[in-house]
Amino acid sequence: MIDMLVLRLPFIDSLVCSRLSGNDLIAFVDLSKIATLSGMNLSARTVEYHIDGDLTVSGLSHPFESLPTHYSGIAFKIYEGSKNFYPCVEIKASPAKVLQGHNVFGTTDLALCSEALLLNFANSLPCLYDLLDVNATTISRIDATFSARAPNENIAKQVIDHLRNVSNGQTKSTRSQNWESTVTWNETSRHRTLVAYLKHVELQHQIQQLSSKPSAKMTSYQKEQLKVLSNPDLLEFASGLVRFEARIKTRYLKSFGLPLNLFDAIRFASDYNSQGKDLIFDLWSFSFSELFKAFEGDSMNIYDDSAVLDAIQSKHFTITPSGKTSFAKASRYFGFYRRLVNEGYDSVALTMPRNSFWRYVSALVECGIPKSQLMNLSTCNNVVPLVRFINVDFSSQRPDWYNEPVLKIA
């Protein structure tokens, strides 16, 4: 699906001026004039107050703002123009969220996604929209996202952990951008950035953030979004999903042969898809091809102890003063269990204080795990090919209850 679309709409020629900067001719617009014509607010780096009461401002700029839609927001920013940046308005959003309130799955229709951004932008800011040469709109970035499905969240987490050490060729893991449920490759690349992450974890985080807001302070689209995200069927579909996201930038789009002009790209996509192919899926495959070669022949040690974790959590939990359930103690016991699996019963017994070891063993036995089982845990039969869990099935990216979204204007 198209998970992010970044478009740049240049200003009409009559508003664009030029100045010489060294040997470069720089195109720019007068931001104060744009603000007057469109009613937009600007920020000033310097404000000077004179004794006669006059104010002088300099260093005008426009910060990113968010336009509300039915389900989500569209970010936009006015760029004055610079050596490497033609004066324009940049708009960006997740078309999936704008169209349906979530990005667990979604459309690969470039025309529909573009329409969702442009029409909402035009409807919200008609005066600014009229100052732009919409026909010259260019694509700055497309995020193409597809998912592999692990048997459960426990195994999906192990896949992410294994991927942290996978690199190939020019595709390098960006360790500073790796989180517990996310791995990033080539974060600073001007061509494409690749990301793998757990969708169910992200979805739960979004629900938690929205639910923590007082109802009176929630916008109408946040309330709609929370309603959509709380759908049990959606949460069930997201469970076990390992997302592979390609953040594809202009240089990589051009190397694939995609025109950067939005409307030329839409025509290109229509012709391309009419041949029984899918442009967005092939862009995604092209982006991940080098990394996926590293998966060939690779294997990982998989353990499926979700039932054990459930048993431990059902026995060892506490209720905090705020009324929330804490599984801190259960996590320690499960970590001990994983040590038994990886190092063996006798080895762990030799490296822990005797009283602590028996206390942890007793805690696991209380959960219904026989001591004889704890003494004979092994990982030797759990080595499986990595590609078994990195199988992205294009035909099963959406549930059977999916319908192509219909555009709603806020």
UniProtKB/Swiss-Prot annotation:
Belongs to the inovirus G2P protein family. One of its GO terms (molecular function) is DNA ligase (ATP) activity. Pfam families: G2P_X_C (PF05155), Phage_CRI (PF05144). Its EC number is 3.1.21.-, 6.5.1.1. It comes from Enterobacteria phage M13 (Bacteriophage M13). This is Replication-associated protein G2P. Keywords: ATP-binding, DNA replication, DNA-binding, Endonuclease, Formylation, Hydrolase, Ligase, Nuclease, Nucleotide-binding. GO terms for biological process: DNA replication; rolling circle single-stranded viral DNA replication. It comes from the Viruses. Isoform G2P plays an essential role in viral DNA replication. Binds the origin of replication and cleaves the dsDNA replicative form I (RFI) and becomes covalently bound to it via phosphotyrosine bond, generating the dsDNA replicative form II (RFII). In turn, viral DNA replication initiates at the 3'-OH of the cleavage site. After one round of rolling circle synthesis, protein G2P is linked to the newly synthesized ssDNA and joins the ends of the displaced strand to generate a circular single-stranded molecule ready to be packed into a virion. Isoform G10P protein binds to double-stranded DNA and prevents hydrolysis by nucleases. Additionally, G10P is an inhibitor of DNA replication and may have a role in the transition from semiconservative replicative form DNA replication to single-stranded DNA synthesis in the life cycle. It catalyses: ATP + (deoxyribonucleotide)n-3'-hydroxyl + 5'-phospho-(deoxyribonucleotide)m = (deoxyribonucleotide)n+m + AMP + diphosphate.
